[in-house]
Structure formats: structure tokens, C-alpha cells
């Protein structure tokens, strides 16, 4: 058996390549491999076994690629038992000892293959300008999507916390989600402002009388309602929020804060100038807005007395 292996392991005679004027790189590489100065590594047990098996499989399947033959040989080698591998392991040890005896100064130095540049490496911009730009755009889109998702989650949490399941305050959430453009002309603002102020005040009064837990649960949300609506009611709603949080009896303080005396004209003008741009507020429209805001501030809450006390129906 060993004699058969030795006959198979004899290196073939070096083939002399015809020195044509082609100058092919493959022929140069083959000449370098077959040069007598280069010392090959000793074969391991798998290479000793696969040497004869590869030749046999190549003869049986002439159209099979060498890589596919290597895969099949590796799978077959794993299926072999230790007793079947033993003679090939011993032969590999003998070849290694012989190799060390013939070449005592041999040291394995793996040759680094010079890989050809890929297309993306050939045509990249100098300084890596293309990749950072794409990463910046991707990052910006990701941040925008994350912020939008965070706002939607916050709105949904407010709605479910207050007991309104995406229906009671749907329109107000849409108005809060899309900020209004500051460049609206004064004429449209003067026409649309009384109707918008009336709707917001009605919603706020109904929410106070029906459910006090809405004001107690999310004061910031009600504050945003008042800021989205009339500027004249913003101070009253802010005061009611502060008093509702600090006092021990929220219903009494909230109703009394809405039925308090109207503010002075100068304070209301300062408050309007604080919430609206100065150039867009015409002076003739100011008395009408002051009158409307005073009217809604002095309007009594349904279900309360004139002095702001609770009705006696519970006694």
C-alpha cells in the first residue's frame, strides 16, 4: 500500500513551456510555481487521501469543476472513520519528517495575492466624498422618521390616558401636529379668529364640567389647546392649570378661575403682542378681539353659580 502511495506521490516531470511571444501572466505564474527554487509545503493527511480520489472523480465526471470536486472530497473525508484515516495520517507524518530533513531551514511564508481593484474602488471620489454624503442623507431621514414617530406616540398616549380613544379630540391633534404658517395675512386672521376661538372655548368648558380628570391628568395638553386658540384665553387657562395642580380641590378652583374678572386692556394688548407677531396685528382689529376675549372670559361655566361656587344639587 505504501509503495502505491509513493508511486502516486512522485512529482510529475516539469513541463517545458514554449517561449512564445504572448507574454501571458498565467504562464509566468505557472513558471514561478514549477520553478525548482521554490519549496512546496508537505502534504497533510487529507491531501494525501484526496490526491488519488480527485483524479478518479475527475475521470468519472469530466465536466465537473475543480471547486465542486473539492467540496465533495471534503464531505467524504469527514465521513471516514478514524481507522480509515490512520494510514493517511501516518503517511503525512512521514512526509513531514522527510521534508524537514531535506529542508531544515524551511519556513512557511504565505504569499499575499494581489487582488485586482473592484469597480467601486476604482471609481470612488477622492477623499471619500460619496460615502459620507449618502450616510448623512440616510441619517437625516432616520432622525426625521424617529421624531415623527415620537410625536405620534405622545399624542396617542395622551388620548388613551384621558379616556378618549382617537375620536374626541382627533381634529385638535391634527391641528397641533401641523404648525400654522406665521405668514397669514391680517384679514384672514381677523375673519377666522372669532369662530376658532368659540370652538376652542366650548371644548374647554365641556371638558372641565364633564371630566375633571382630563385637566388633572394632562395640564400641558390643555395649555396647548389654549395656546392654539385665542390669545386672550391663554392667561386664564394657564392660571387654571397652575391652580388645579397646586390646590387640593381642583373643581372649585378651576371654575372660579374661569369666572374671574376680566383683565385690563393694556395687559391683554401685551399678551396679544407676546403670542402674535407685531407686524401682523392691525390696530383697528384689536378692540374687537379684546371684546370677544373679555366676553368669553366673563362667560359663566354651565352648572355653576354667579360667584363661582358649585351647585347645591349634591346636598
Curated annotation (Swiss-Prot):
InterPro entries membership: HMG_box_dom (IPR009071), HMG_box_dom_sf (IPR036910), SOX_fam (IPR022097), SRY-related_HMG-box_TF-like (IPR050140)
Top-level taxonomic group: Eukaryota
Coiled coil: none
Tissue specificity remark: First expressed in the embryonic neural plate shortly before closure and expression continues in the neural tube. From stage 16 onwards, expressed throughout the CNS including the brain, with expression predominant in the undifferentiated cells of the neural epithelium. Also expressed at a low level in the retina and the gut epithelium. Highly expressed in the lens placode at stage 13 and in the lens at stage 17.
Bias type Low complexity, positions: 241-259
Compartments where found: Nucleus
Motif window: 9aaTAD: 270-278
GO terms for MF: DNA-binding transcription activator activity, RNA polymerase II-specific; RNA polymerase II cis-regulatory region sequence-specific DNA binding; sequence-specific DNA binding
Annotated signal peptide: none
Keyword Nucleus: yes
Assigned GO CC terms: cytoplasm; nucleoplasm; nucleus
Region feature Disordered, mapped onto this chain: 1-42, 241-264
DNA-binding segment(s): 39-107
Keywords attached to this entry: Activator, Developmental protein, DNA-binding, Nucleus, Transcription, Transcription regulation
CDD domains hit by this protein: HMG-box_SoxB
GO BP of this protein: brain development; cell fate commitment; negative regulation of neuron differentiation; negative regulation of transcription by RNA polymerase II; neuron differentiation; positive regulation of DNA-templated transcription; positive regulation of transcription by RNA polymerase II; sensory organ precursor cell fate determination
Domain notes: The 9aaTAD motif is a transactivation domain present in a large number of yeast and animal transcription factors.
Physiological role: Transcriptional activator. Binds to the consensus DNA sequence 5'-TCATTGTTGTTG-3'. In cooperation with other transcription factors, binds to the promoter sequence of the crystallin gene to activate transcription in the lens. Downstream SRRT target that mediates the promotion of neural stem cell self-renewal. Keeps neural cells undifferentiated by counteracting the activity of proneural proteins and suppresses neuronal differentiation. May function as a switch in neuronal development.
Protein name, per record: Transcription factor SOX-2
